[in-house]
């Protein structure tokens, strides 16, 4: 730890924020030591679903898992995976082992821990399809607890862990299905081509909003209102996808939040639909 560490590389919007307390634990004991020394913590994976609202953070200790808390082990068609493992790395490792189930997420820039909290989804699949169990740390009792899949409530863009206060996901166990590499690669190639044609290549945190109950995609409504390309500061509604905001270089968290509020107001005014953010504001 040092005075004010940049968080730019730890959020996919590439917001230029800084924090006084930043830690990179390598094991459970180091994590417990950090928990015991700070009252206010934020556990960060790859930062693919977060918005830093401030330039400087003095009161929050950021615990980043993707740098050192990121090992996994594959035996037969099972994998034990620490929270900081990137979905992309796990997807390629399982592909090389002729295992199917996680390849849908190979282009999702999220960590396993973050994906489990939000029940990450892509192209109709959800992360919990392959989950066997999730192990967490209770920050109050300092106890480690394993949840079997049958005991985990989850649904569209949420899991039980999203609403549990003072917990931290440590690891998960996955069960995959054997398939030929050719079949898995065909799916990887299809996802890659769809992403290239439909999604922006600039810094972004992906879909900003949950799909509304009206079941009309936010991107379609934004496009119908002619809002694609709208910009506040360097935050812009992607010209490629109306449900995504990109950073054109120097967007602040406040630029992004102002643009989110603008979109919400426009959708409410013209469609009478209230949008809810999928992303987490810190």
Curated annotation (Swiss-Prot):
Per the annotation, which location comes first and is thus the protein's main one?
cytoplasm
Q: Which UniProt keywords apply?
A: Cell cycle, Cell division, Cell shape, Cell wall biogenesis/degradation, Cytoplasm, FAD, Flavoprotein, NADP, Oxidoreductase, Peptidoglycan synthesis
Q: Which EC number(s) does the record attach to this protein?
A: 1.3.1.98
Reactions catalysed, as given in the entry: UDP-N-acetyl-alpha-D-muramate + NADP(+) = UDP-N-acetyl-3-O-(1-carboxyvinyl)-alpha-D-glucosamine + NADPH + H(+)
The listed locations are: Cytoplasm
Q: Where is the active site?
A: 157, 207, 278
Keyword ATP-binding annotated:
no
Q: Name one GO molecular function term.
A: UDP-N-acetylmuramate dehydrogenase activity
Q: Keyword Cytoplasm on this protein? A: yes
- A GO biological process held by the record: peptidoglycan biosynthetic process
Question: Which Pfam family, just one, is annotated for this protein?
Answer: MurB_C
Q: What InterPro entries is this protein classified in?
A: FAD-bd_PCMH (IPR016166), FAD-bd_PCMH-like_sf (IPR036318), FAD-bd_PCMH_sub1 (IPR016167), FAD-bd_PCMH_sub2 (IPR016169), MurB (IPR003170), MurB_C (IPR011601), MurB_C_sf (IPR036635), Oxid_FAD_bind_N (IPR006094)
Question: Which intervals hold domain FAD-binding PCMH-type?
Answer: 15-179
Pathway given in the UniProt record: Cell wall biogenesis; peptidoglycan biosynthesis
A GO CC term assigned to this protein in UniProt: cytosol
Family membership: Belongs to the MurB family.
PANTHER family in UniProt: UDP-N-ACETYLENOLPYRUVOYLGLUCOSAMINE REDUCTASE (PTHR21071:SF4)
Entries under NCBIfam families matching the protein: murB
Q: What does this protein do?
A: Cell wall formation.
Q: What is this protein called?
A: UDP-N-acetylenolpyruvoylglucosamine reductase
């Amino acid at each position: 730890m040092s005075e004010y560490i940049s968080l730019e590389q730890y959020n996919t919007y590439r917001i230029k924020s800084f924090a006084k307390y930043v830690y990179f634990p390598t094991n459970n004991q180091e994590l417990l030591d950090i928990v015991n020394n700070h009252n206010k913590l934020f556990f960060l994976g790859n930062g693919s679903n977060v918005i830093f609202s401030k330039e400087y953070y003095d009161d929050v200790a950021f615990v980043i898992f993707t740098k050192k808390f990121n090992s996994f082990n594959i035996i037969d068609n099972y994998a034990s995976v620490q929270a900081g493992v990137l979905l992309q790395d796990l997807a390629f490792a399982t592909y090389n082992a002729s295992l199917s189930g996680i390849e849908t997420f190979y282009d999702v820039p999220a960590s396993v821990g973050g994906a489990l909290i939000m029940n990450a989804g892509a192209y109709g699949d959800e992360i919990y399809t392959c989950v066997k169990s999730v192990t967490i740390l209770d920050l109050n009792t300092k106890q480690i607890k394993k949840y079997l899949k049958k005991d985990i409530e989850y649904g569209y863009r949420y899991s039980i862990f999203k609403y549990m206060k003072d917990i931290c996901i440590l690891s998960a166990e996955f069960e995959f299905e054997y398939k030929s590499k050719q079949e898995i690669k065909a799916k990887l190639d299809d996802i890659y081509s769809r992403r290239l044609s439909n999604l922006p290549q600039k810094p972004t945190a992906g879909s900003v909003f949950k799909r509304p109950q009206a079941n009309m995609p936010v991107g379609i409504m934004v496009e119908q209102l002619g809002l694609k390309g709208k910009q506040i500061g360097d935050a812009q509604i992607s010209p490629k996808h109306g449900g995504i905001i990109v950073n054109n270089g120097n967007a602040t968290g406040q630029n992004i939040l102002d643009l989110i509020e603008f979109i919400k107001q426009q959708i409410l005014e013209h469609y009478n639909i209230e949008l809810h953010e999928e992303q987490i504001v810190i």
